[in-house]
Amino acid sequence: MRPLRCGERTQGIPLGLLAFWVTAARCLQSQGVSLYIPQSAINATVQQDILLSVDYICHGVPTIEWKYTPNWGVQRIVEWKPGTPANVSQSHRDRVCTFDNGSIQLFNVSVKDSGYYIVTVTEHPGSSQSGTILLRVSEIRYEDLHFVAVFFALLAAVAVVLISLMWVCNQCAYKFQRKRRYKLKESTTEEIEMKEVEC
């Protein structure tokens, strides 16, 4: 076996250091929690069911907590560990469904559900990750159009009734004038006959 030269040793040392640093970086990166939110803003209409979707990566079993921040403060929605029953707040009971990946589904949303939703995934104290989703809920515009359509249909019905009444009144007036002319014609004929008789 031939002896190692000095240059060959130094080439091996940087490769070893590089491998050490890559391994250390992966170990440090694998500790803790990673949180992914695919959609940070969601637009919805009243009475829809909305999925607030997230995904996390961690080595242990985390605790997942969702909070809601309306204009007046912070309100806890739900807290759970995957595989265990969720602790749902009274305000959202029967309106929320949890998933093991950390996502929640809100049923039958209303305008008052608009606001920021904060998810916190905690693996152990000191190792947590938070994210925010903005939910905007708006009224259904079709209700306004429905009201306008009903209003115009009602106006059209009233117009048809008024036109029908005007036609009936016109027919009555025409018949009345016809009778009057006939009577006037008869009376004129009688007067002429009487004048002829007197002469």
Swiss-Prot record:
GO cellular component: axon; dendrite; membrane; plasma membrane
One GO-annotated biological process of the protein: positive regulation of excitatory synapse assembly
Membrane-spanning intervals of the chain: 147-167
PTM description: N-glycosylated.
Renumbered residue ranges of the record's region Important for CDC42-dependent filopodia induction: 169-185
Keywords annotated in UniProt: Cell membrane, Cell projection, Developmental protein, Glycoprotein, Membrane, Signal, Transmembrane, Transmembrane helix
Region forming the signal peptide: 1-27
Subcellular location: Cell membrane; Cell projection, Dendrite; Cell projection, Axon
Reported consequences of knocking out the gene: RNAi-mediated knockdown mice have significantly lower density of dendritic filopodia and dendritic spines in embryonic hippocampal neurons. Lower density of excitatory synapses and significantly decreased dendritic spine to shaft ratio of F-actin in the later stages of neuron development. Aberrant neuronal migration in the cerebral cortex of developing mouse embryo. Neurons settle in the marginal zone (MZ) closer to the pial side and the corresponding percentage of neurons is decreased in the dense cortical plate (dCP), reflecting the overmigration of those neurons.
Glycosylated residues, chain numbering: N43, N87, N101
Protein topology in the membrane: Single-pass type I membrane protein
InterPro entries recorded: CD2/SLAM_rcpt (IPR015631), Ig-like_dom_sf (IPR036179), Ig-like_fold (IPR013783), Ig_sub (IPR003599), Ig_V-set (IPR013106)
Segments on the Extracellular face: 28-146
Domain Ig-like C2-type as annotated: residue spans: 35-138
Tissue note: Highly expressed in the central nervous system (CNS), with the highest expression in thalamus, hippocampus, cerebrum, midbrain and spinal cord. Also highly expressed in stomach, kidney and small intestine.
Coiled coil location: none
Oligomeric form and interacting partners: Can homooligomerize through cis interactions within the same cell membrane.
Function: Cell adhesion-like membrane protein of the central nervous system (CNS) which modulates both the position and complexity of central neurons by altering their membrane morphology and dynamics. Involved in the formation of neuronal dendrites and protrusions including dendritic filopodia. In synaptogenesis, regulates synapse formation by altering dendritic spine morphology and actin distribution. Promotes formation of unstable neuronal spines such as thin and branched types. Regulates neuronal morphogenesis and migration during cortical development in the brain.
Protein known as: V-set and transmembrane domain-containing protein 5
